[in-house]
Amino acid sequence: MLFRSDAKVAFAPVIAKVTLVRRFDSLQRLMDAQDFALGLGTQPMEALVELDSRIAANRRDFAARFDRARLLMAHQKWTEAMDELLEILMRDKAWSDDLARKAYIAVLDIIEPPKPKVADGQIPPDDPLVASYRRRLSSAILS
């Protein structure tokens, strides 16, 4: 969350184009997650404990799962956030107008390292973590 305010300032001139470029949308979703985390007003661990208890009481509390994923995203706990979003996708693919899927894709966009330059006709290597979570998303969506 250290770069949040700098990112907002840098992002302001292109905010109108957010829906046109997926990478911008992904950055906006990250900043929204950071705003959510800041707005909780409690310590992150306290908020996680509260969300965990809500989820334990109702495994289908997708709002709590999504809030937990946003909190994890804000603290750059990418794999934990994607695992939580996958839990939503496996139970209800279209929950809240595909919000979990969109957030999941945003995390993939954010954590994917830049592709190295390769010779013409060659395919750049995939990041193993990103490739693994893309497969998991495909499995959840297509099942």
Residue ranges of model-derived segments:
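Alpha-helical adaptor scaffolds
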Residues: 17-58, 127
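Structural register within alpha-helical repeat arrays
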Residues: 28, 68, 103-104, 137
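TPR repeat positional signature
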Residues: 51, 65, 101-104, 133
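Short, small-residue-biased leader/transition segments that mark boundaries at the very start
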Residues: 1-2
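Inward-facing hydrophobic residues that define packing positions of alpha-helical scaffold repeats
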Residues: 8-12, 51-52, 84-85
